[in-house]
Amino acid sequence: MSSGTPSLGKRNKTPTHIRCRRCGRKAFNVKKGYCAACGFGRSRRLRKYRWSKKWKKKKNVH
């Protein structure tokens, strides 16, 4: 099997992200083994940045 375009079609069988055990969001990367949203699997501390606070505030206003 070549490593170009034909093999990229095989990537759609398993999901890239599944539901995270810690935050519950669908952001846990199966291959890398950590959550993109909260950082579970990569560190014990919760993943948070100052640049994301504005978005979280806006999200809670609804």
From Swiss-Prot:
Keyword terms, alphabetized: Metal-binding, Ribonucleoprotein, Ribosomal protein, RNA-binding, rRNA-binding, Zinc, Zinc-finger
Record InterPro entries: Ribosomal_eL37 (IPR001569), Ribosomal_eL37/eL43 (IPR011331), Ribosomal_eL37_CS (IPR018267), Ribosomal_zn-bd (IPR011332)
An MF annotation (GO) of this entry: rRNA binding
Cofactor: Zn(2+)
Entry superkingdom: Archaea
GO cellular component, one term: cytosolic large ribosomal subunit
Binding-site positions, Zn(2+): 20, 23, 35, 38
One of the Pfam families matching this protein, by short name: Ribosomal_L37e
First and last residues of each zinc finger (C4-type): 20-38
UniProt keyword Ribonucleoprotein, yes or no: yes
One record GO biological process: translation
Cofactor note: Binds 1 zinc ion per subunit.
NCBIfam families (alphabetical): PRK04179.1
Stated role: Binds to the 23S rRNA.
Family in the record: Belongs to the eukaryotic ribosomal protein eL37 family.
Annotated protein name in UniProt: Large ribosomal subunit protein eL37
